[in-house]
Amino acid sequence: MAQRRFFVGGNWKMNGNKESLEELMSTLNTASLHEDTEVVCAAPSIYLDFARSGLDSRISVAAQNCYKVAKGAFTGEISPAMIKDCGADWVILGHSERRHVFGENDELIGQKVAHALESDLSVIACIGEKLEEREAGTTEDVIFAQTQVIAENVMDWEKVVLAYEPVWAIGTGKTATPEQAQEVHEKLRAWFRANISEEVSDSLRIIYGGSVTAANCRELASQTDVDGFLVGGASLKPEFIDIINARA
């Protein structure tokens, strides 16, 4: 069994200004963070430079999205090369808000994953079902189909973290119970064992995203197949430190 390093990503989404983010970064920089936890903060693209220069080197920086090619006439998009040039090492791809607010489909997300990895960015690849899909009993069908397209575009799984984010639990205050999260993570790990390899199944970090707070993070972190979190709103608050230290 591979030892999987606990991973906590903070997705700032479209929030903050220089003043508030500087205050947040100062709080993180002076906090006692569990050394066995990998921490990544995903800043709005316009603040990537600001975040990288302002955060302690023990905290990595991610972009929240990128495009599938290196350059060109794609107004408003940013490339993995640009993200790297700002000093960031990670990118979030396939987030439910990109899928459901901006209409990104599995094929496009797969192409983005492939290009980001080719460009030497590490990827937080997101999957997850909507409430109606869970209620219809199709959770596995949905997340396995999403995972399949991502997997077709990954050559090196060492640079990928898979984030399971039930869409019904994002920003709603609803959270999957620790048992619900563990059940899905366990099924995902079994999918990788059956479809990719035993080695990838054992080593791949599968993290949970969906209204993670200081109040529920420890119980979620205690689950065997939950290897960390992708945190939204709480990553902008001091409680993010408690979430980072959920396994301390």
UniProtKB/Swiss-Prot annotation:
Main localisation: cytoplasm
CDD domains found in the cross-reference section: TIM
Catalytic activity, reaction form: D-glyceraldehyde 3-phosphate = dihydroxyacetone phosphate; dihydroxyacetone phosphate = methylglyoxal + phosphate
Residues the entry annotates as binding substrate: N11, K13
E.C. number(s) listed in UniProt: 5.3.1.1, 4.2.3.3
InterPro entries cross-referenced by the UniProt entry: Aldolase_TIM (IPR013785), TIM_sf (IPR035990), TrioseP_Isoase_bac/euk (IPR022896), Triosephosphate_isomerase (IPR000652), Triosephosphate_isomerase_AS (IPR020861)
Official protein name in the record: Triosephosphate isomerase
Species for this entry: Oryzias latipes (Japanese rice fish)
